[in-house]
Amino acid sequence: MKEAIARSGADPALMNYVVVGNCVPTESRSPYVSRVASIQAGLPMSSVALTINRLCGSALQAVVSSSQNILLGDSDYGIGGGVEVMSRGGYLSQAMRNGARMGDTKLIDMMVAVLTDPFGVGHMGITAENLATKHNLSREDQDAFALESQNRAAKAIAEGQFKDQIVPITISTRKGDVTFDTDEHPRATTMEALAKMKPAFKKDGSVTAGNASGINDAASFLVLAEAGVAAKNGQKPLARVAGYAVAGVPNEVMGEGPIPATKIALERAGLKLDQIDVIESNEAFAAQALSVTKVLGFDPAKVNVNGGAIALGHPVGATGAIIATKCIHELHRTGKRYGLATMCIGGGQGIAVVFERL
């Protein structure tokens, strides 16, 4: 957040509304994450902050919510994004507060809970299996998609495409300082290696760890402003929010959420699909992403050109801002005009945002 503010060139004192997406509780300050992050990023005590949970769509919703705050006149500047530390996801004891009178008790893995359908379908991987069946997607289709995601991400990293998007973080260890400046999740693989992986969620299924997104940690933020105020203060925006939408779908095929959300967002933006130059479609699972591409008729050459979540990871509450950042940077790299960021949401929703490069 601090780096996003610095890059914007705006005065932190003017950042008066922060919206942060977060899903998995990790510590005692988790309920305060938006407020703590904003104050530690240098915002004044007079600023306000809001933590939201729209599951996988949380950070993209935070961008939308910040835009809405500006449109409503609640703020001139806003910050939208998200954070997720899945590696530290907490365990919940429902019995400890009032005492377990006798017998065994259990702990609930709140990280896995976020990845589990709330209506009894099971792990989100089962919803991907449902889509593979519905849209006739073979194991080979999914593995080929996963391999392409890995290859595109590896190429983008080698070419330094993410250098301007990632803020290096240095931590001290017993062996000295370690700097993280490159995504850890991508890994070289082959169709043969992917074919050897066992189904992860269903006996004789086709969804594996190799063609699904990972368990990851990240934070990502965008600074938003009212156009007139930004111009008056000498800031040149990278893009504008041209349209957005959230839509509901049956929970057992929650991965189809981007389909209606994208249609509505494009309509609100006054655009047709063929006018979209860059598409960031979150890869929760290969079966899910392939289904969205198939139904909407996306041109695969425009989708996740620098790799997607299967390769780069899916830190649930942060991913939306990450793909928005990727989308906007790719628009500037290529000189294209319109971009789309869209993703499915557990429980049966989808979100989509259209950006125009400025």
Which positions does each model-derived feature cover?
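Conserved active-site "lid/cap" helical segment
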Residues: M1-C23, E27-A37, A41, C56, ...
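N-terminal extracellular/periplasmic Venus flytrap/periplasmic-binding protein-like
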Residues: G9, D141-K232, V295, P300-K302
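Conserved catalytic cysteine-centered active-site region
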Residues: V18, N22-Y77, P118-M124, A188-G214, ...
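Active-site pocket-lining segment
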Residues: V20, T127-E129, F162-Q165, A242-A311
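Active-site-proximal alpha-helical scaffold in enzymes
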Residues: I52-E84, A132-Q161, L222-G228, P315-K336, ...
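Flexible glycine-/small-residue-enriched beta->alpha junction loops
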Residues: L71, Y77-N130
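Condensing-enzyme catalytic core mediating Claisen C-C bond formation in acyl metabolism
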Residues: M191-E192, K196-E256, P260, I264, ...
